[in-house]
């Protein structure tokens, strides 16, 4: 990895409730950015970020772990934080080192206690937050219900930037509302934008 000026380095904590897909999202980002030749899976115990034997056994993070990726002339340090309350100190460590916090929210469960703790930790440090509604491939996931749940919990400043286009209960593509572009997804690979 090349050397970067401080202005081109971002530290992003990935936080949220246990089981909301923090490590899986981080692994997808690492893979998409070319930081790994394979997509690590928590269920298979082969992720870059959960490499401790206890984490592999639990299928859950117990410490904050960092992985750097390169994207558009920036170095982004992803800080994967634990969601289990027994290891809550890892959440605060990760948020303390971060410039912003990406908060994963389950598309099935919505806002949970871990979501609230992540928001409170980010707010205490005055950090920017972005919510990522995860697990939308599951047919019981409901993006718009979770979005309304987020607004009810954290106020009207919660606004969508990228939303799924749902067909027959499945996310068919994603629409970037700022760019007015739709992106078709095939597993982890994102195609070029198409006009819809």
Regions found by a protein language model. Name each.
Residues 1-105:
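P-loop NTPase switch module centered on the Walker A-proximal segment
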Residues 9, 74, 97-100, 124-129, ...:
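Short glycine-/polar-rich loops that comprise or flank the Walker A/P-loop
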Residues 24, 28-29, 90-93, 97, ...:
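Alpha-helical scaffold elements adjacent to nucleotide-binding pockets in ATP/GTP-utilizing enzyme cores
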Residues 65, 81, 132-134, 179:
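A secondary-structure boundary/capping signal
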Residues 84-85, 97-116, 123, 127-141:
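Conserved Switch II/interswitch segment of TRAFAC-class P-loop GTPases
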Residues 139-187:
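Canonical P-loop GTPase G-domain recognition
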Residues 186-196:
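Residue-level detector of conserved catalytic or cofactor/ligand-binding positions
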